[in-house]
Amino acid sequence: LNGYSTAQFGKCHEVPVWKTSPMGPFDAWPSRGGGFEHFYGFIGGETNQYYPSLYEGTKPLEPPKSPEEGYHFTEDITDKAVNWMRQQKALMADRPFFVYFAPGATHAPHQVPKEWTDKYKGKFDQGWDKIREETFARQKKLNVIPETAELTARPKEIPAWDEVDPNLKPVLARQMEVYAGFMEHVDHHVGRLIDVMEEWEILDD
C-alpha cells in the first residue's frame, strides 16, 4: 500500500463486534479491508496465550505446537513477524515495509512461562503502597520525572496495603509477580524485532 509491504501481527481489536464471526463479513478485518496485506493473530481484545483463537488472514488455524512443546502466543507472533520481515528483505530489498505488532500482553489473561514470573518472587511482598513510593523515588533519580513532582494520592477504591486481609496479600503479591513477568517476557520479544532492525541499520527509519 502506497509502495509499502504491510503486515499486522497479534491483537486486532478494531473489528466491530458484529463483524468478528469466522463466517464473515470480513470487510473490516486487517487483510481484507483494514489496510494490511498480511495478518496473523486474533480478533478481539484478549485471547488465551497458550490456546489462542488464531487466524491467518481470515482463515482460522491451530497453533503450530502445544504449550507442552513450548508454545506461547507472544513468541509465536514474534517468530512470524521476524520471518516475514526477513522474507521481505530477501525478496524485495528495495521496498519499504510496515509492521503493526500488537501482542496480547499485558492484557488479561496474564499467562506467561513460570520461569519469567519466578524471577519476581518476593519482589512485591512489601505491598503496593511501598512499591509506588520506591518507584516514584527511582523515577526522580533517573530524571524520568521532575524533581518537583509530587506523588499522587492512592485512589480511594484501592485499600491501603496495611488494611488488606493478610490471607489475601500473598495472592495479590503473586498477581503482581505474574504481571511483571508477563511484561518482561513481551519486552524480551519486542527486543528480538529491534535486533533485526538494528542488524539492518534501519531502526531510525
Q: How would you label these PLM feature ranges?
A:
Residues 1-205:
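Formylglycine-dependent sulfatase
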